[in-house]
């Protein structure tokens, strides 16, 4: 397994036997048709390094997209929360649809990295962190890695009206990633 850390100087790879600085960008990795092969090639003769004490989120120019209502318990909770607004049947249509509920979450400059605080909306009374398995998908649609994510949600805003989802989910520092891409 290779762990990739990002810092102000670029990428650091940690394998079972070494820690090295890579001559590689995350953008190049995400654009590669075979990120694993590119990474293994760049590991050869790479200079030694140390794991950063203050890393960055493992993304460069990539957008974060998320999938909503991914399990039954989530659907049930959302239905209950939006019942007063008449939105309880809305989630039946989302959960049973052919197309998944995908939504835009953040651009890189709006993402909290390791050790950085996420933010909450001032106009919300019920803000919830949602731990996520975050997939790294290259430009050809191949999953080549994963990291830990945090998807902050203003549940009272979403519950008021399901169409308020962007307001409940998309704001500065509403997402966090890292510390490493595996």
Which residues does each PLM region occupy?
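N-terminal basic/disordered segments at the start of proteins
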Residues: 1-16
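Short non-domain terminal segments
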Residues: 9, 28, 101-102
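Short, mixed charged/polar active-site loops
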Residues: 11, 19, 143
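N-terminal cap/recognition module
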Residues: 15-42
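Active-site microenvironments in enzyme catalytic cores
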Residues: 37-182
């Amino acid at each position: 397994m290779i762990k990739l850390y990002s810092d102000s100087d670029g990428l650091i790879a940690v394998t079972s036997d070494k820690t090295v600085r890579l001559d590689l960008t995350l953008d190049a990795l995400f654009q590669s048709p075979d990120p694993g092969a590119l990474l293994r090639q760049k590991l050869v003769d790479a200079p030694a390094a140390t794991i950063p004490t203050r890393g960055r989120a493992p993304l460069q120019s990539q957008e974060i997209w998320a999938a909503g209502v991914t399990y039954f318990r989530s659907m049930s909770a959302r239905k209950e929360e939006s019942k007063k607004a008449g939105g309880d049947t809305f989630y039946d249509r989302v959960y049973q649809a052919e197309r998944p509920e995908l939504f835009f979450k953040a651009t890189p400059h709006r993402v909290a990295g390791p050790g950085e605080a996420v933010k909450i909306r001032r106009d919300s009374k019920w803000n919830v962190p949602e731990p996520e398995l975050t997939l790294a998908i290259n430009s050809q649609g191949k999953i080549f890695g994963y990291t830990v994510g945090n998807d902050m949600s203003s549940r009272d805003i979403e519950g008021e009206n399901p169409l308020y989802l962007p307001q409940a989910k998309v704001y500065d520092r509403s997402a966090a990633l890292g510390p490493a891409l595996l």
